[in-house]
Amino acid sequence: MGRLALISVTDKTGIVDFARQLTEEFDFEIISSGGTAKTLQSAGIPVIKVGEYTGSPEILGGRVKTLHPRIHGGILARRDWQSDLAEMEANQIRPFDLVVVNLYPFEQTIANPDVTTAQAIEQIDIGGPAMLRASAKNFAHLTVISNPKYYEQYLSQLRQNNGEISLEFRQKMAGETFALTNAYDGAIAAYFASLNGETTRFNLAGNALQTLRYGENPHQSATWYGSGTMAQGWGKATLLQGKELSYNNLVDLEAARRLIAEFGSEEPAAAILKHTNPCGVAIGGSLVEAYTKAFNADAISAFGGIVALNQAIDEATAKELTKTFLECVVAPDCSPEAQDILAKKSKVRILLLPDLTTGEKQTVKVIAGGFLVQAADDVVETPDEWRVVTEKQPTPAQLAELLFAWKVSKHVKSNAIVVTKNQTTLGVGAGQMNRVGSVKIALEQAAEAAKGGYLASDGFFPFDDSVRTAAQFGIEAIVQPGGSLKDQDSINAANELGLIMVLTGIRHFLH
């Protein structure tokens, strides 16, 4: 008898050509089930159906097809154990040389926001993972392939090794398979956690998208993984031009995406970041105005920065973008005319990400011996929910300015202070160990332009020194979360100095 392959795939990419080469070039017999058998038979490839081989028909609407001793015995049998071989002979079980299986599209199914629980459950594969895990466990005696990208490598192994498959390759395929089943079960567990609330286990899995040149620094290795279906996110971004993305590029781009997402897409907005902190953010009457305002907010820091735009890049904006060196520019789209202009700066990475507003619902940080998971800080706030605590009341226009400053402060490393005017950042104080230190940095950067401006603080003021410093620079209104035992001291200082103060009740620390 020739070699025996078991093929049962949902993703039929390349399966016909692969099966044809197995049968015609290497004398494989193929056992297959359901839609895979029909696909191969319609292509003229001889197939033994699972039901014919096992003597048991598919039952329960196809829920039970391959869960049979003649299938799993042929997968799990140890070819160097006489007792296993004797049992196989007694039960007319043939050993498989190759198992090719991929799984029902569970993650793609639950990516649909309208999917019902019943629909999701029907896409939980049972037989597929069972065959994959059994095959991977027994890699010493057979090969398992769970991804079409390995079909050609398997054929090359046969050709180069006189029809044999190396143990190294079989072990590699086993590892890939266990990683797949782990991720698949993790997605199912995460789905049920979303239905039931918090769970005692958290699974984090992904597919390697790219081996990066290095991490934050040249001596650190790094890999980019994609999670879930990647229906959104950077794995779906189009790189129009420029070199491949680096680790630092991706970290900065995600920070820029989160910030620009605050402003939706109706009003043109631009953000420029360095080392994940904004150095210039603005809203304008046009995209080019928004970008120009953001750039001029801190032209020195903008050099080599990451730019995020919430509308398609037009010709006028493209011309401004080419006037300085930038690492990356991301926008939802780019006109052909703008592309031609940007091409003159071929080293600038231009990315298109149509949906800049959709991000992960959780954030993860690795610590020694584990990791921390928290809900993303994606709360949507409006001034209607805020509390004015000073005698002086803000106008609607002033509240709009405070909201702009508040949105930006959320994306600055704590302790964070943002000074703005005309919906443009004037000064950003980031990452200082005391809040008044960040206040001074932001105000000194804004300098005389701070007069009549607005100040946002991501955390409360422990003392009134920040308020008094702001008043010295002519700040008109302050927005902060409140919550200090000495809130009243800051409120009293604001009243004494004629400032407006608004408390949001929500803190936005960023570490």
From Swiss-Prot:
UniProt keyword annotations, A-Z: Hydrolase, Multifunctional enzyme, Purine biosynthesis, Transferase
PROSITE patterns hit by this protein: MGS
GO biological process: 'de novo' IMP biosynthetic process
EC number: 2.1.2.3, 3.5.4.10
CDD domains: IMPCH
UniProt catalytic activity: (6R)-10-formyltetrahydrofolate + 5-amino-1-(5-phospho-beta-D-ribosyl)imidazole-4-carboxamide = 5-formamido-1-(5-phospho-D-ribosyl)imidazole-4-carboxamide + (6S)-5,6,7,8-tetrahydrofolate; IMP + H2O = 5-formamido-1-(5-phospho-D-ribosyl)imidazole-4-carboxamide
Location of the MGS-like domain: 1-146
InterPro entries registered for this protein in UniProt: AICAR_Tfase_dup_dom_sf (IPR024051), Cytidine_deaminase-like (IPR016193), MGS-like_dom (IPR011607), MGS-like_dom_sf (IPR036914), PurH-like (IPR002695)
GO molecular-function terms, A-Z: IMP cyclohydrolase activity; phosphoribosylaminoimidazolecarboxamide formyltransferase activity
Listed pathway(s): Purine metabolism; IMP biosynthesis via de novo pathway; 5-formamido-1-(5-phospho-D-ribosyl)imidazole-4-carboxamide from 5-amino-1-(5-phospho-D-ribosyl)imidazole-4-carboxamide (10-formyl THF route): step 1/1; Purine metabolism; IMP biosynthesis via de novo pathway; IMP from 5-formamido-1-(5-phospho-D-ribosyl)imidazole-4-carboxamide: step 1/1
GO cellular component terms, semicolon-separated: cytosol
Keyword Transferase: yes
Domain free text: The IMP cyclohydrolase activity resides in the N-terminal region.
NCBIfam families: PRK00881.1, purH
Family the entry assigns: Belongs to the PurH family.
Record-given protein name: Bifunctional purine biosynthesis protein PurH
Organism: Microcystis aeruginosa (strain NIES-843 / IAM M-2473)
